[in-house]
Amino acid sequence: MAFTKSKQPRKQRKALFNAPLHLRRKVMSAMLSKELKEKLGKNAIPVRKGDVVRIMRGDFKGLEGEVIKVDLKRYRIYVEGANNKRQDGREVPYPIHPSNVMIIKLYDKDEKRFKHIKNE
């Protein structure tokens, strides 16, 4: 997926910031576990709400949980169990970049998604 043909970092960054939502989805890809790689024949696919992921980097490294929200505008996902405590004691979900997670189990209620993955 080429936003721009330029090699200049400033133009690459600008393309990311100004990308339309349908192209942002592609950037929100995460690597697949070994079993899923063999099954699907792909290294990475876009993350979706309902997928089960393992966090590979950061403070929550090793945590496995379901994706509860995908934020295309901020390029972040929210995983069940990855929470920060606010000053008043409330738990708030912690935003994680999809490059720092591995998809362990795909959301299986969407047949159309599997057909789309196979055709790519």
UniProtKB/Swiss-Prot annotation:
The keyword Ribonucleoprotein applies. GO terms for biological process: cytoplasmic translation; ribosomal large subunit biogenesis. Gene3D superfamilies: 2.30.30.30. GO terms for cellular component: cytosolic large ribosomal subunit. GO terms for molecular function: RNA binding; rRNA binding; structural constituent of ribosome. PROSITE patterns: RIBOSOMAL_L24. The keyword Protease does not apply. Disulfide bonds: none annotated. Keywords: Ribonucleoprotein, Ribosomal protein, RNA-binding, rRNA-binding. Signal peptide: none annotated. One of two assembly initiator proteins, it binds directly to the 5'-end of the 23S rRNA, where it nucleates assembly of the 50S subunit. Located at the polypeptide exit tunnel on the outside of the subunit. PANTHER family: 60S RIBOSOMAL PROTEIN L26 FAMILY MEMBER. Part of the 50S ribosomal subunit. Belongs to the universal ribosomal protein uL24 family. This is Large ribosomal subunit protein uL24. It comes from Methanocaldococcus jannaschii (strain ATCC 43067 / DSM 2661 / JAL-1 / JCM 10045 / NBRC 100440) (Methanococcus jannaschii). The lineage of its organism: Archaea, Methanobacteriati, Methanobacteriota, Methanomada group, Methanococci.
